[in-house]
Amino acid sequence: MTTSTPLEPTARTTVNRGRNRSVADRDQLHAFLADALVAHIGVVVAEDGQSHPVVLPAAFAIDLDGPDPDGTLYVHGSVAAGWLRAAQDATVCVTVTELDGLVAGRSAFHHSMNYRSAVVIGPARVVDDPGERQHALDLVVDHMIPGRSATLRASTRKELAATAVLAVPLREASMKARAGGPVDEPEDVDAGVWGGHIPLHRVAGEPVTGEDANGPAPADVVRRAASL
């Protein structure tokens, strides 16, 4: 298994604001990425002779033993997506955020949010190797529901031909996190206005069996719903 190295800030990933919220432990980054569900990828695309940035949500997964030093982040996409073609061999930015609470300060200035957030910057690579691509797609499925890929039929050639995977090295990354209540000015505290925070939690409902499904939800789905 890959031995993780500390997060080493680069000119592109150095945290300049809220440095006290910066996370230096790469293992914490890995744990956060394993928990989060949605990534946003930013890339510059060209249309009608003009370039502009786009940021799009995507399913993702990480492989700490992947082909890149410090692991690989895989982003799920479609071969028909223009942003994915534009990302090939380009530098992209992938962000992942989980909102953990709303912070009510005693002034508008000190209202905030509790969160965990990661930024990964690096050269993107469209995965062409069939073995790596299938492995990455299995990881994406298992990131949603652990163990699910082993219960599914093999993907058809048509399905694989329509599906693309983008690989981004995990080496150049940063993470920030905030927790707890507001940090208010003493005079605002003395004024008597309420301050505090509202914790937010991700909660899953009971699995809903499809009308054409046979039997109840399988164990992997039930376990996943219970763990969210």
Where are these regions (language model features)?
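C-terminal edge-of-domain segments
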Residues: 1-12, 128, 132-228
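A generic structural signal for short beta-strands and their flanking turns/coil linkers
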Residues: 37, 56, 69-71, 88-92, ...
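Short, structured beta-strand-loop surface elements
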Residues: 79-139
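Short hydrophobic-aromatic micro-motifs
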Residues: 73-76, 94-96, 118-120, 166-167, ...
